Amino acid sequence: MTIRSGERQQQTCTPSRVLLTGGRAPITLDLARMLHRFGHRVYIAESMEQHLCRGSGVVEQCALVPSPRHQTTAYLSALEACVKRWQIDLLIPMCEEIFYVAQGAEQLRKHCRVLVSSPEQLHALHHKYDFIQLAKSMGLSVPDTYLIQNSQEQLEIQHVLIKSGEWVWKPVYSRFAAKVRMPIHQAPPGEELISRGSPWVAQRYIHGRGLCTYSVVHEGQLVAHATYESKFRTGDVGASVFFEQVEHDGAYQWVKQFVQQVAFSGQIGFDFIEESDGRVYAIECNPRATSGIHLFHPGDGLVRALFEPESLLNEKKEITPQSGDKAMLALPMLGSGIRQANSRANLRSWMTAWHRARDVVYTRQDKHPFFAQIAVVLAAWRIARAQRITLTEALTHDIEWNGEQQ
């Protein structure tokens, strides 16, 4: 049985104290609002001083903590202190700091429940080559993918790539399509960018529609799931800024088989390409929360899936958004609209999407985060300028995980 958004769920779990990490992310703000709606007390731990959840009316308190990436030990100590001080019942890592939280999960679980898988499993799923090999071993559809760790390996594989169509190049550790090199428009990375410590993959380019999924999984069983189409992005291949729920049995069955075979627990997302015949190929895995959260409304039952997955499994219920539900990040969506202006058809499509989707950041009852976006972007811009990195990279530079301590 699937619970649609029209069938509002009764919240049965006792109000709890929940600590979310990644207060800079819209998904964290959206989940915080859902939790607050059902009486839970929400706390935030964030390493950026300026973030979306700061000042939100649904958040009890925020803590500024050290960088997970650059000060891991201090970060975990600060997180444990937050858990004890606020008497947290459930800790949910929301962004890439999940890899660091996983390293300290054993200690943190002495004080509260922590929604995180093992560091080893997270690494296997995050690694863009290891994930493909794992899925391939299960007989699941994935594109041909080659691991390149040095200039010699790049040279050896060139003859295969030249004869075999178009290829996408991307770092093994990357996010939001950062540094991705698409065929035709961009050349392969130079040998100075590739090393054993910074490997890349060459992945066969598949023409088709981009689809993404978000799921909550308990011991290999789906308890919540959304599939959504990526129509508008920050760039040609950047992060999605518009999300529309679609029904897609192929993607659903792919995810269901994969999470069952790896016995996953937690939040997880996948990126797919759907060919014209409807077949889907998984190209990446994100073993953490993703933007699919935005498609769930407070009454849909996502909070219950996070708190009481066992009860949903016992009742044989699975939470999904209503087909056709739409959401967007309004400010970057405006930027995407400017890019559509050179085509009347594209602009018309964008305008239709704009008018039919809700902004996930702005609500009348909690306006502060909408205006906080300006401060967040300005802070990231200063970091980008100082470190000579892109704005997207600046937004994750202190929390991203690139295989360290493996």
Task: Show where each model-derived region lies.
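Glycine-rich phosphate-binding loop signature in dinucleotide/nucleotide-binding domains
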Residues: 82-88, 161-163, 196
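Glycine-/Pro-rich loop/turn segments that contact NAD(P) or position catalytic residues
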Residues: 121-145, 150, 155-162
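Glycine-rich phosphate/pyrophosphate-binding beta-alpha loops
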Residues: 177, 232-235, 240, 286-299
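Phosphate-binding site of ATP-dependent enzymes
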Residues: 184-253, 273-281
